[in-house]
Amino acid sequence: MTPAIFSPTTLPPSTATWPCSTSQKLITVRSPLKFKCRATSSSSSITDFDLYDLLGIDRSSDKSQIKSAYRALQKRCHPDIAGDPGHDMAIILNEAYQLLSDPISRQAYDKEQAKLEELRGYTGKPIYSVWCGPETEQRAAFVDEVKCVGCLKCALCAEKTFAIETAYGRARVVAQWADPESKIKEAIEACPVDCISMVERSDLAPLEFLMSKQPRGNVRIGVGNTVGERVSNVFVDVKKFQERYAKAMSRTTKETSQREVQISAVEAIRSISNWLYWRSSPYTKPLSPESNMSLTFTKRKKAVDPDIRKLQDVVAAMKQADQSGRTKEKGSAYLLGEDYWSPSNAALPSSGNNNGSKASSNPQVTRKTFPSEEKPTSRRENRRQFRIKKFPIGTAIVAVFLVQYQASYRAASELNDHIGGSLALSIVNSPWQQILLAGVTWYFIGAMLLQLVEAVQHKLEDKET
């Protein structure tokens, strides 16, 4: 790791002893005002943490803002106020302030953090595709999404392996070796821009991660298609990315007791930083003198006063991790989600009709539906429709039987005249017309009664919720 350069002239009076272990050496640089601490052991460094987040400032803060944040935290972390844990916290604060107040050290720290930012979110596993092939297979299919024009040919030839993501309309491998090798080769040969490649299995995860960072736009089929603006070539950067990731992993695995002390001190400072944030907020009430002097330090605990902005970020990250975990467990069920189009077999054009009509050259893409995709709301709606059909039919059948039963006793007596005219007289005297009219009438009456009951039930449920 690049050693940090500190200036002894900016060292606060509280740090009478330099925070290096006995196994560390002080190496003097030519300038008498600057020296650096090189660790000869595997002890951790303050640069492993986000110092801007630690001080509660932005990365664009100037030197005066850094100094104000440092002084505000140092007042709360002083050993006379915070007790014994305040000693470690004061050391961490001094190191952070010295690093960020020096322009050269801050620039080197920002560059190091930018390198670590490139690795943020990378887990060493593929993001989009799942492995469906044999474990002995060392090849994998990969789509250069920046180069892809969204022709759908790969998804039509090997529909289990390739899919079209709905955000930009580009092809993507969602299941490795889910189709026979012959179909995958056919899909590679059918690509008009040669954006599908066979890569090493060990390079699949970093390639997909680097591809997710590339800017993309919606594809436009036609002459002069600008499919995307590439920032860098992922095939060239994959080896460098793997080297940086291996170096970062080897550094993070070397944890010592000094790192445990630093982590505890950093978390305590963060709790104080959050406390100061809430105390200075115009939307919060002023704290009492008792709470003003209260500082409870617990090892490996988070902030006492939570920061809503940080909490929202954590919740969003947890939801994203949970969603990605569920999607990986589904395997080839990627094709069932709403993020991809799944082309139907009927849309596959015939080989002898390549120069056909416009309709055949633009196959429609449909989404497969499965019974497992049916939502609980749709099942409740189906049961509701079944009840609507069942109850009115029952009332109509009962009415038909009652009218027929009454008509059997009045068969001998018929009316000779009716106020409604001849049509009404024929209906009254005809038993079959009476039965039909009674069935239709009571069917609608039953349907209206059912709607009324359901409306009352929904109103009661809304009041309960």
Curated annotation (Swiss-Prot):
InterPro entries linked to this entry: DnaJ_domain, J_dom_sf
Induction and repression of expression: Induced by salt stress.
Record Pfam families: DnaJ, Fer4_13
Keyword Chloroplast listed: yes
Sequence ranges of Basic and acidic residues compositional bias: 370-384
Phenotypic effect of disruption: Altered root hair development and reduced hair length.
Assigned GO CC terms: chloroplast
Transit peptide: 1-38
The name this protein goes by in its record: Chaperone protein dnaJ C76, chloroplastic
Gene name of the record: DJC76
